[in-house]
Amino acid sequence: MLILGIDTSCDDTSVAVLENRNILSNIVSSQIKFHSKYGGIVPEIASRKHIEWIWDVTEKALSEAKTDLKDIDLIAVCYGPGLIGSLLVGLCFAKSLSYASGKPLVGVNHIEGHIQAIFLEKSYPEYPFLCLIVSGGHTSLYRVNDFGAYKELGRTRDDAAGEAYDKVAKMLGLGYPGGPVIDALAKEGCNEKFNLPRPYLHGSLDFSFSGLKTAIKVLLKNLGYKEGNVPDEIKKDIAASFQTSVVDVLIEKIKWAISSEKLNRVVITGGVAANSELRRRAEMLKDKGINVYLPSKSLCTDNAAMIAITGYNKFLKGEISDLFLNARAYLPL
């Protein structure tokens, strides 16, 4: 079966073609250069770029997969959560293709897509397993009992981890997005230079990163530096200290979840799962007998392949969406 996957949930226009569970193409067109000067994503710009690019990206995905639209058997599309204007572009496009071709349509939850991304890899866990989704919009822990059977164990109470990265990067004058540049700078800094808080929220598997962000703001003030005007060496040390604090919390929460759920299989996914320090620390958990699974970096960030495989699995269970499917900015799993 050939599946066409479409994801326009945020600022990446992505289209993929899968043959069952095998990736034939997975095209991602990034809008970063259009948003970076604003320090974050501008929803209207994101929507307009999706409209401009969606057909070209689809043609590229089909071409790379050496197939044609008429050969596609199933169309899977992300319908939430995300930016409503962005979601509507991909959803309306997918519904139009479905209507014109008569091919079945399956709507996919973006968060479920991140969880299922690991099954695109050669190495993946048996059910049940724990899953940490950590990205710019989400930081949540789930117990995954089976496909479609998810129990939320904890979530962020304020800023998601990726959002905290972006906000700290802005304070340091590093631009947008903050994750990759902080990750790179942290390798050159001392992570013990500044003693930043670790918001563990003892007794809970929830997350909270707003206090850590505030601690950086106070630190800059105490050091006598204005936001956006910080010496390079200080930037490096703050980046290293901040990243260590975030990763410490994420790893500790995983350990707590393993203990409470009596499970030693863990998937870490989402855009922040591409972070080198988080991946390094996650690999170290294997020394403690914990089975850790990380998608390749290209499958951690937003992509349509994860939407396609999730749609495929839903289709196999007999789940099909109609043309009245609506985009949902907020969509619980």
UniProtKB/Swiss-Prot annotation:
The gene is tsaD. It comes from Thermodesulfovibrio yellowstonii (strain ATCC 51303 / DSM 11347 / YP87). GO terms for molecular function: iron ion binding; N(6)-L-threonylcarbamoyladenine synthase activity. This is tRNA N6-adenosine threonylcarbamoyltransferase. Required for the formation of a threonylcarbamoyl group on adenosine at position 37 (t(6)A37) in tRNAs that read codons beginning with adenine. Is involved in the transfer of the threonylcarbamoyl moiety of threonylcarbamoyl-AMP (TC-AMP) to the N6 group of A37, together with TsaE and TsaB. TsaD likely plays a direct catalytic role in this reaction. It catalyses: L-threonylcarbamoyladenylate + adenosine(37) in tRNA = N(6)-L-threonylcarbamoyladenosine(37) in tRNA + AMP + H(+). Pfam families: TsaD. Keywords: Acyltransferase, Cytoplasm, Iron, Metal-binding, Transferase, tRNA processing. NCBIfam families: gcp_kae1, T6A_TsaD_YgjD.
